[in-house]
């Protein structure tokens, strides 16, 4: 049986042994989280989109594709809009002065994002029947497929953006809150990045890649009008998926929906319609804008 003196001696020896073990233990090799850059952005008007709600962008060799958003069914009722006589939604190709070059009509509904690749536009619905509409340059629908990873018996939910990159389709998937890379032929998901939003900006919209391969995602707050709106951008490391930047916009900036990268600059469009806002509340409604550091 240990007396008090023996107990104290043993305790000191154990502590010394533990300290020595800690000094010789393998170092922590986990990759440290990168510092998150912060900053302010501003928008500058470039040109007006064709008449209608512009809610998606895609750069092409010929110019810029713009996705038309129409409000129909429950969406039209919610915004107090009449039911459109033609439910089809357009993909407009314009030059970099805003001149209309081509119009492709699609069966997308409440279109809230698009991509251009492999000679097709890929239109992302945010209303029943949901999914991605692949359409060729003659307006022929090649496919209509749901966003992957839905539960059995469910559709894939809505999307607020898409991007074509290196032969793959990236989708901003709303229901699972993921940025998904999908093989456009097999429709199998290959990569999933969590859409990280700050508590004050729970909404997410379109995504794009910059020249370094990093990912930018439009974010925003829940608000009742343009003055209350606080749009933002989240930047992800394109190799790790980790957040490396969070940016706010100067007051008076456009309300960004679509997002693209062209000639070293982020490009966006202000749809002129926003959940919870009066229609056309943004003074930049209908404008394509560039985004730059303030």
Language-model regions: role of each:
Residues 95-97, 136-140, 183-187, 237-241, ...:
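Short loop/turn segments that connect beta-strands within beta-propeller blades
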Residues 1-14:
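N-terminal secretory signal peptides and thylakoid transit peptides that target proteins
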Residues 42-47, 99-104, 141-152, 188-197, ...:
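A short beta-strand motif characteristic of beta-propeller blades
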Residues 260-294:
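Blade-level signature of beta-propeller repeat domains, shared across WD40, Kelch, NHL, RCC1
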Residues 89-92, 131-133, 178-180, 231-234, ...:
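A short loop-to-beta-strand structural motif that recurs across blades of beta-propeller domains
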Residues 51-60, 108-117, 149-165, 199-212, ...:
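Beta-rich, blade/repeat-based domains predominating
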Residues 50, 66-75, 83-85, 123-128, ...:
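Conserved beta-strand positions in repeat-built beta-propeller and related beta-rich domains
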Residues 30-50:
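A short helix->beta-strand "capping" segment at the edge of beta-propeller domains
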